[in-house]
């Protein structure tokens, strides 16, 4: 594998954002914390991009992009519900930190499931596969099966099988 493990990359990005949000609650400087998290994410992503682009992958054979419009609609509805819950809890003079955490718990769980374990973008090359733009795997590192019109891909250190309709 060249690059970084996609799951660890995404989890580290979410942890950086979570820490910056917690720091912004105490220091009231949300913009600085937000920019710092995206600078750290950008440096890590640039490192992965350079590692993958310097690898001899061969010719691009096929690309599978992640479906996302249904998930985005669902997340938008959850964000509206989250704001509503936050306003209800804040109006009853609960602690603002507790209302912040409770109102965004559901949204965070859905984001975790879709962002971390959702179907990633995969590019098939002659010599291997680029997985979610942050890791390149040789064909020997993959377990690919075809079953009932689905392409099932199992990648080492990825928690679930990835299924795509052919």
UniProtKB/Swiss-Prot annotation:
One term under GO cellular component: plasma membrane
Membrane topology: Multi-pass membrane protein
Localization per Swiss-Prot or TrEMBL: Cell membrane
Domain of life: Archaea
Membrane-crossing residue ranges in chain numbering: 7-27, 30-50, 69-89, 92-112
Alphabetical keyword list: Cell membrane, Membrane, Transmembrane, Transmembrane helix
Family note: To M.jannaschii MJ0795.1 and MJ0785.1.
Keyword presence, Oxidoreductase: no
Protein name: Uncharacterized protein MJ1249.1
């Amino acid at each position: 594998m060249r690059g970084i493990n996609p799951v660890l990359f995404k989890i580290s990005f979410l942890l950086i954002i979570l820490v910056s949000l917690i720091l912004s609650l105490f220091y009231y400087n949300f913009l600085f914390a937000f920019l710092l998290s995206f600078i750290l994410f950008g440096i890590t992503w640039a490192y992965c991009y350079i590692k993958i682009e310097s690898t001899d992958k061969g010719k691009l054979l096929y690309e599978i992009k992640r479906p996302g419009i249904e998930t985005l609609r669902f997340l938008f509805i959850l964000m509206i519900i989250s704001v509503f819950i936050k306003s209800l809890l804040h109006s009853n003079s609960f602690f603002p930190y507790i209302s912040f955490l409770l109102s965004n718990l559901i949204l965070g769980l859905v984001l975790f499931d879709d962002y971390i374990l959702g179907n990633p973008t995969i590019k098939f090359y002659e010599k291997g596969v680029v997985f979610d733009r942050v890791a390149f795997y040789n064909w020997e590192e993959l377990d690919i099966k075809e079953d009932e019109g689905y392409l099932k891909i199992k990648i080492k250190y990825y928690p679930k099988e990835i299924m795509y309709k052919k």
